[in-house]
Amino acid sequence: MGNDKTNMIIAIALSLAVLLGWNYFVAAPQVERQRQQQAQTSASPSPKEGGPSAPVPGTLPGASGGNPQAALTREEALARSPRVRIDTEALKGSVALKGGRIDDVALKGYHETVDPKSPEIVLLSPAGSANPYYAEFGWVGQGAGPLPNGDTVWTADGDLLTAKKPLTLTWDNGAGLVFRRTLSVDDKYMFTVEDSVENKGQSAVTLYPYGLVSRWGKPHTQGYYVLHEGLIGVLGDKGLQEYTYDKMAKENPLGSPGTRGLSWPGVTGGFLGITDKYWAAATIPDQKTPYTGSFTERDEGATKVYQTSSLGEARTLAPGAGVQASQHLFAGAKEVSTIDAYRQKLDIKQFDLMIDWGWFYFITKPMFKALDFFYKLFGNFGVSILVVTLILKLFFLPIANRSYVSMAKMKAVQPEMTAIRERYADDKVKQQQAMMELYRKEKINPVAGCWPVVIQIPVFFALYKVLFVTIEMRHAPFFGWIRDLAAPDPTSVLNLFGLLPFAAPDLVHLGVWPIVMGITMFLQMKMNPAPPDPVQAQVFTFMPIIFTFMLGSFPAGLVIYWAWNNLLSILQQYWIMRRNGVKVELWDNLRTTFSRSSPVKAAKG
């Protein structure tokens, strides 16, 4: 019968309405109020009482001298500065002695494609290359003489930076200040940057430590609503802040001419950086010292420069005194275990939000933990998806059982419901009253069929999010032709699943697993008789076909989950219906569906 399917549509519509309504009426107004408050704060930065004027966010270094009109090759840009090599288990690259920037980082073990011989992922690139992307640390201030900038050439105490061998850079400004920077890196993706200044001059100076990540040009993005790519940070009690590249263009002027952005003064704890789907670069200020965080977009010729920066409080150095500032830089893959470990070890506020877990965080992250647990047990994320789906089915079995029992009762009274519709065909009010009386008499809950679908919606979105955003799913194989669960099924019916020598267009991409999913969805719907309403009957007839094509471009892992979940639902419903003495109409419905043309054939005969 059609009530359970009608309930399914209602449940999906209501769930989507709740999600969209929350975003429109609650989340969006809150974000807009915060944006306006931040813009007002940013527009008029005030000097610190009793001291020199603080530098204005948006005027920090790092947003100049980056990209010449004719971009150099990456190798040519690297050769413009003497360098100290970086070599760890997870990273390779170099530190530029000119500018003291970390601007050359590639990720070992991560490749551009599923082919292990494809190039490794390059995360950071130097100024002057086609797409500069780098991290910079230093000092700004007044009356201190020359300060280190992008043209400063530092002196290094070694020629290699490893997890066991730190690197110290030194520079004397010739005006009484000696700058030292000690760089260290662990065996994953975290750099520690310890800056110190010694005042050998005759007068006091005031300096402000800063750290920034600068990216030249808008990168290619996935363009999905469920995924944030762009500027990201947790700014103390201001919480998570996410700004896309396009959104930055709409911000108010800040600092230097041609610069737009916003700032958060006086925050403590958190991080600021730029994130891609799987990779990120972020500076991490001292978690106990207040700072001003800022996001900016700057026009540099025809190029947009995106920058996140933290500006620490004023440090005054008397003659003969010294000062230190310690920060961190994360530059690498957003591995869940690594991100969580850094959050705990370095006590970085909400660092786990570097990964876009989405609205269903409370479901999404436990979902990943479960998948990861069974992956470590079986060594295959595809098998892990099957096991977790089975466990979820067993966990929700009591609710599903009550739902299917109610549906079975509704099937049993189907003749009476049909009679009521015929008896009150012209009086919908009396028809509804008679239906409700029948439900009360037979102790039937007409909306019970919604619950399995309502429960499945957040689980579906959570699994979709896990497959879509976690790097652990990237290039994770299943069996056979599925070499990447995070990518669509590579086969296509249009080229006979690879037998014909041409690639099928993405628009009509339809692989083996989407077809399997469509078949299981079709069988699940045939477990119940067609609804009496012809329009509903047509909708449910075409629904498996629509979903088959729609899921053709979805991650293979998600399609496998849906097909497996459909199969388990069929078995579960079959068992419950048999247990309650209700006839399983699957085979009768299939015979009816595939024999509809028989009378026509007989007439022709």
UniProtKB/Swiss-Prot annotation:
Ranges that cross the membrane: 8-28, 377-397, 451-471, 496-516, 540-560
GO CC term, one of those recorded: plasma membrane
Membrane topology: Multi-pass membrane protein
Assembly mode: Interacts with the Sec translocase complex via SecD. Specifically interacts with transmembrane segments of nascent integral membrane proteins during membrane integration.
Protein name from the UniProt record: Membrane protein insertase YidC
Family statement drawn from the similarity comment of this UniProt entry: Belongs to the OXA1/ALB3/YidC family. Type 1 subfamily.
InterPro entries xref list: Membr_insert_YidC, Membr_insert_YidC_N, YidC/ALB3/OXA1/COX18, YidC/Oxa/ALB_C, YidC_ALB_C, YidC_periplasmic_sf
Keyword check for Hydrolase: no
Keyword Acyltransferase: no
Main location (coarse class): membrane
Subcellular location: Cell inner membrane
Annotated Pfam families: 60KD_IMP, YidC_periplas
Source organism of the structure: Methylobacterium nodulans (strain LMG 21967 / CNCM I-2342 / ORS 2060)
Physiological role: Required for the insertion and/or proper folding and/or complex formation of integral membrane proteins into the membrane. Involved in integration of membrane proteins that insert both dependently and independently of the Sec translocase complex, as well as at least some lipoproteins. Aids folding of multispanning membrane proteins.
Signal peptide: none
Record region (Disordered): 35-71
Disulfide bonds: none
GO MF term set: membrane insertase activity
GO annotation, biological process: protein insertion into membrane; protein transport
